[in-house]
Regions:
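Short beta-strand-to-loop capping motifs
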Residues: 7-9, 49-54
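General N-terminal targeting signals
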Residues: 20-22, 26, 50-52, 68
Length: 88
């Protein structure tokens, strides 16, 4: 499944946070969560992450793990090609 995560930093990130994030991404990859794209953004959210996970439960586990650093809103994403097939 593909997800879009919207995140707001709880505090100003520093170099240690960036290094910790790199390590955590590798740990998630070993658990089957694959980061497809990651952007720092301007506006209501500080970051947007597009990732794959096996299920909603796995995506929720990831959100819980990072809740000390960021608040998140996670969306389930359906590729356009698949969504168009649902239109009658």
């Amino acid at each position: 499944m593909i997800f879009v995560g919207l995140a707001k930093f709880r505090k100003k990130p520093d170099k240690k946070d960036v290094g910790d994030t790199t390590k955590i991404i590798e740990e998630w990859k070993a658990k089957g969560i694959n980061m497809l794209n990651w952007y720092w953004t301007l506006g209501s959210f500080d970051a947007v992450v597009v990732f794959e996970a096996e299920s909603e439960k796995e995506a929720m586990k990831m959100s819980i793990e990072i809740s000390d650093w960021v608040t998140t809103e996670t969306l389930v994403a359906i590729p356009r090609e698949e969504a168009v097939k649902l239109v009658k």
